[in-house]
């Protein structure tokens, strides 16, 4: 049977000079679906899990550090002055990084033409971008404590250093999720002991890892493991506690802090090292599995907390929304931080 010819093609744009003339549906109405597909929310994971202090003015904040002393028996006739040893003092200083900003400009004419709201989503995205920058900076500082060269790796001699724990097998040998999960759990067993040997409190210990490592731990703790129900929630796929550590899943584990450009790493502060072995680097993007710490290991100093500002830009006939904060981030206690890394191949 011959094909029908001459029928109307109401959806085809047959205007003169149209480039996409082959699209037979071009003129049909595009009905608003009722939902704007916004980016999934990004959540800060470090804000409530490390030390945060606010200052009203100044460029930095001082954190005094005190050492330890020891007791000694005093025999009759001996002088305390002959036995006394001074308690050493030092300090850690966290400097404000500067004013971190994110903004968007909404033109009146485009806002009038648009048929769905964007302001609330734009505002959320601005706030999230600053929160992610703070997260990245804190996580990079944990890695930084692990990478300090030996002559600076303790606040005061005897207080302890950061702990870097290698897996027993290299990365290539740990492609199986269950095997990797068991390696991480074994490493956290060593991490627990290392922190306790440094007299780090048992409460407020956290292990940050990427989704692959988090899933590996889940796989190792699933129903074939003893007491799995006390450690994980199988329905939600979440981990409650492993070896005294709150396990936190972080997609942006190695992102680092913000820089001077909105894209790329130009002028980036709080850089997460890229490669192990460069200088004194023991923990880097190419070998890290996870970072562990006590909440006192890293600090944030706030000069200006996260705030939103709305301004009228009459010369552009537009509204501007600005998110901003002035904070600084830094390592405080090397003895309360550490990392789990893959064995060197």
Curated annotation (Swiss-Prot):
Organism: Escherichia phage T7 (Bacteriophage T7)
InterPro entries in the cross-refs: Capsid_Gp10A/Gp10B-like_dom, Capsid_Gp10A/Gp10B_dom
Name the UniProt record assigns to this protein: Major capsid protein
Keywords of the record: Capsid protein, Virion
Its job: Assembles with the minor capsid protein to form an icosahedral capsid with a T=7 symmetry, about 60 nm in diameter, and consisting of 415 capsid proteins. The major and minor capsid proteins are incorporated into the capsid in about a 90/10 ratio respectively. Once the capsid is formed, encapsidates one single copy of the viral genome.
Subunit record text: Homohexamer. Interacts with the connector protein and the minor capsid protein. Interacts with the capsid assembly scaffolding protein; capsid proteins and scaffolding proteins form building blocks that assemble to form the procapsid, each hexamer of the major capsid protein interacting with 2 scaffolding proteins.
HAMAP family: CAPSID_PROTEIN_T7
A Gene Ontology biological process term: viral translational frameshifting
